[in-house]
Regions:
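P-loop NTPase Walker
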Residues: 1-164, 169, 266, 320, ...
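ATP-hydrolysis module of ASCE/P-loop NTPase motor domains
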Residues: 35, 40, 117, 137-141, ...
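Conserved helicase C-terminal RecA-like lobe
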Residues: 217-221, 404, 418-430, 443, ...
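C-terminal accessory regions
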Residues: 633-865, 873-882
Length: 882
């Protein structure tokens, strides 16, 4: 009887626990219920990996390893069985007295550490844990980024490795300032060995866990290598003297701490018995070592990642970490999450087609229960301006159908590709946001105030002191600053300490008054920090230093940016207040400075703003949008020119394409251009091999109207490697493809799906090769008979029957695309006119300025305030008041 009750209860317990995670699919539940030992979760794009992480942590804390177990802490009674049956049937929680019977080896929330790559991901994880576990228990789980976790460890143990607990975190600009000082001391010519190159080499060494001493001991391959090692040692010495870490140091120094101090290592292994790491495919050598050192003897480590999305090799990430995980951690259980909840099946099939060409991968195939959706739209543009117009057309159509600007993202391989899109959107009045532009905290006035705050937090921070000692101007010149630095170095003290006794140094006699005034400012700020709230302290820094007065004076003189800079400082104070509200009693100056040091580009992305988003594919990792435009899909652009010479680099480019494709939820638009200007040079590139890897059944191809017109007139749109002409059609070749000189290749084929063979192609073009026809561009050499309906040279695609019109899309009124077919003449506005904008709504014209045959119109919109736009390009309609 007892045994049967035991079995019945355990079966009911499994059912009860499974119902708590009823929204998960089978593979997700497997991942959640695998609690002990090393676990590798290969999570495909859009497969719900964050959901799995949150639910796995919740299961560890609420039930432990109870699911699938036949163990109970005491003998089962009929009352236990009855109570559990009732809870299952009614969908209610089991009674509290039964809690102990539902758990086995349950984990305390403070014994779990979850590491992510982005602050945004860490924030989402914390929020979802709070919602699932309750505020207090959810907050006790340590969910953090790699760098934030390291800062937390170093704040407690930095003194063990010779640094103060109040250390400063240097950003790229600070590192460059330190390096300039090192170059000056070592008499190194920046033209021979650029500072940027030295910093990059140092970063690689730290990622590889190479110390300055090891770098000096290792024989250099050339003079620059020897210089880099000397610079590395001198740079680290300066950072140690300043009590500062750069961004790479946060992980590098934490690894050194854990490796060299067994007591510290054991403390964290005992504290965090369960370790979960997200985005494991993007970990570096140093991050792998950190994870290994934090993993305790029980090896309760769970890593989540997708080898097909490993795209950060240029930052030191190594895909081998995830590919070799099972070998490094014997006994690993591997679970694949292949069901996608994000995209349509056509988008996923396109992604699968591309990524299957990689060899360095674990292997998985995404699938979905979502609708088939529209085919992937592939557009061939005449040039980058045409590409931008096409994107505006599509967005305009979506807006007419009730869509939102924020539903759209334009993704590109490199930042340089954004300029034509941004320029066109600006002229067309399409609100947009570039992610990865200048960050708020990188603005000069903001960095200056943060530097003042930093020297109050860390008096040894000579780099930040140098930045602001004469900002605003105080008659403290570079010569005086150099003397202060020399005196500090001679005595082994900080520059601030020298300034505090400036009157004791004869060498500083000419600058006594300015230096003493600066010291008085510093003392006032110290007092403010001790006696006032953190946001009040920030306001004091802005005012006591004279910074606010300087900007107010600039504004009075008519300096255009002074008012904006003052607003930025007001926002800085708001940011400090928000930080205090979020952290409560734990708020501190050091904590605030940590937060701003660890902010990434993507953290500034505001999803609630109704704007089209422009960003690199690297920045888009982890995001999703209903409509995605993947531009510049051409050989030499994507994949990049350099990647062609390395199979590993080419596979990384293909993974990047896979990431770009899988950002799309509803519709994906891919474009390539016959000609493109990049870095001041016009390039004529073949369509990307990644396009050709997508099976024809998943794509729909369209072309620029200009290419269609040239096709109908008998002009080719291609070019050859040796014959100039290209877009104008004066080419000696009509296309490319295996055993064919045309795009179309075989009869009825699509040029995108020919196997690329550079040695066999006769030239680049876009010859039409419809059903029953051949591509007959200049010099094609095709002998197949041509059917009626295609007499043009080039500019075609291998479609059945006649070429398809370029677009069925309706552009929004007033957009440049809408006026492309026929000019309607210039628009003219006057002050006082009432206008209607497609996006901004109704407004009144405040000012009009002539500009290159157009007008710059300043309009006060009722909904969004004052905006400037170009009259001939903005979607504006003049309204007659009744």
């Amino acid at each position: 009887m007892a045994a049967s009750l035991q079995q019945e209860f355990c079966a009911l317990r499994d059912t009860y626990i499974e119902k708590q995670f009823g929204r998960l699919n089978d593979m997700q539940r497997q991942a959640v219920f695998t609690t002990d030992g090393p676990l590798l979760i290969l999570a495909g794009a859009g497969s719900g990996k964050t959901t799995v992480l949150v639910n796995r942590i919740a299961n560890l804390i609420r039930f432990g390893s109870a699911h699938g177990s036949s163990w109970t802490p005491r003998e089962v009674t009929e009352e236990d069985v009855k109570a559990l049956k009732t809870a299952i049937m009614t969908g209610t929680d089991a009674p509290a007295w039964l809690d102990g019977m539902l758990r086995q080896n349950a984990v305390r929330s403070w014994n779990v550490m979850a590491i992510t790559f982005a602050n945004k991901a860490a924030g989402e994880l914390k929020e979802r844990l709070r919602n699932m576990l309750g505020g207090e228990e959810g907050d006790e789980v340590f969910a953090s980024t790699f760098h934030s976790a390291c800062v937390r460890i170093l704040r407690r143990w930095a003194e063990s490795i010779g640094y103060p607990r109040s250390f400063t975190i240097y950003d790229t600009d600070d590192s460059q300032r330190v390096m300039k000082a090192v170059y000056k001391e070592l008499s190194i010519d920046d033209k021979f060995f650029p500072i940027k190159s030295a910093i990059n080499q140092m970063s690689r060494w730290k990622d590889q866990l190479v110390s300055p001493e090891e770098a000096l001991r290792t024989p250099a391959r050339d003079t620059k290598g020897a210089i880099a090692a000397k610079v590395y040692a001198a740079y680290e010495k300066k950072l140690r003297e300043a009590g500062a870490f750069d961004f790479d140091d946060l992980i590098y120094q934490t690894v050194q701490l854990l490796a060299e101090h067994e007591d510290v290592r054991e403390f964290y292994q005992n504290k965090y018995r369960y370790l979960l790491v997200d985005e494991y495919q993007d970990t570096s050598v140093a991050q792998f070592r950190l994870v290994s050192l934090l993993t305790g003897p029980e090896k309760n480590i769970c890593v989540v990642g997708d080898d097909d999305q490993s795209i950060y090799r240029f930052r030191g990430a190594t895909i081998e970490n995830i590919l070799n995980f099972e070998r490094i951690f014997p006994g690993t259980k591997t679970i694949r999450l292949e069901q996608n909840y994000r995209s349509t099946s056509n988008i996923l099939n396109a992604a699968n087609c591309v990524i299957q060409h990689n060899t360095e991968r674990k292997g998985k195939t995404l699938w979905t229960r979502n609708d088939e959706g529209d085919k992937v739209q592939v557009y061939t543009a005449e040039n980058e301006q045409d590409e931008a117009m096409h994107i505006a057309d599509v967005i305009g159509e979506h807006l007419k159908e009730g869509g939102h600007l924020a539903d759209h993202a334009v993704l590109y391989r490199m930042n340089a590709q954004s300029a034509p899109i941004e320029s066109y959107f600006t002229r067309a009045g399409i609100p947009h946001k570039i992610v990865g532009g200048q960050r708020f905290n990188d603005r000069k006035e903001v960095k200056d105030i943060h530097s003042y705050m930093s020297i109050v937090a860390n008096a040894r921070d000579d780099v930040r002191l140098r930045r602001i000692i004469n900002e605003p101007a105080r008659k403290i010149g570079n010569t005086t600053v150099d003397v202060i630095a020399d005196l500090a170095a001679q005595q082994g003290i900080s520059m601030l300490e020298v300034i505090s006794h400036a009157d004791a140094y004869a060498k500083l006699s000419r600058a006594i008054m300015p230096l003493l005034k600066f010291w008085q400012i510093y003392e006032k700020l110290q007092e403010s920090l001790e006696t006032r709230t953190l946001d009040e302290f920030a306001q004091d820094v802005i005012e006591v230093t004279g910074y606010k007065a300087m900007l107010e004076a600039d504004a009075a003189k008519g300096h255009e940016d002074a008012a904006d800079r003052l607003q930025n400082l007001g926002q800085l104070v708001n940011n400090v207040k928000n930080y205090c509200d979020q952290h409560g009693e734990d708020a501190s100056l050091e904590g605030y400075l940590e937060d701003i040091a660890l902010i990434s580009d993507i953290d500034s992305y505001n999803e609630s703003a109704d704007q089209v988003v422009l960003m690199t594919i690297h920045s888009a990792k982890g995001l999703e949008f209903p409509y995605v435009f993947l531009i510049g899909m051409e050989e030499g652009v994507f994949p990049s020119e350099m990647s062609k010479y390395s199979e590993a680099d080419l596979e990384e480019e293909r993974r990047l394409a896979y990431v770009g494709i899988t950002r799309a939820k509803k519709e994906l638009y891919i474009s390539n251009s016959v000609s493109r200007m990049l870095y001041g040079r016009t390039q004529r590139n073949e369509p990307s091999r990644f396009l050709r890897e997508i099976e024809p059944e998943y794509i729909e191809e369209t072309r620029s109207p200009a290419l269609e017109r040239r096709s109908s007139m008998g002009w080719g749109s291609g070019y050859s490697d040796t014959v100039p002409g290209g877009a104008s059609g004066y080419s000696g070749a009509s296309g490319w493809g295996r055993n064919s000189s045309s795009f179309g290749g075989r009869t009825g084929g699509s040029y995108l799906n020919r196997e690329y063979n550079a040695s066999e192609r006769g030239g680049f073009g876009s010859g039409y090769a419809g059903r029953g026809s051949s591509a007959s561009g200049f010099g094609s050499g095709s002998s197949a008979p041509r059917a009626s309906g295609s007499s043009g040279f080039g500019a075609g695609y291998g479609r059945p029957a006649a070429p398809k019109p370029a677009s069925k899309l309706v552009s929004f009124p007033g957009s440049p695309a809408a006026s492309r077919p026929a000019s309607t003449g210039p628009k003219h506005y006057e002050v006082g006119d009432i206008v209607e904008h497609k996006v901004f709504g109704r407004g009144r014209v405040l000012a009009v300025k002539a500009a290159a045959g157009d007008q710059i119109v300043e309009i006060n919109f009722e909904k969004v305030g004052v905006k400037k736009t170009m009259a001939n390009f903005a979607p504006l309609t003049k309204i007659t008041e009744e």
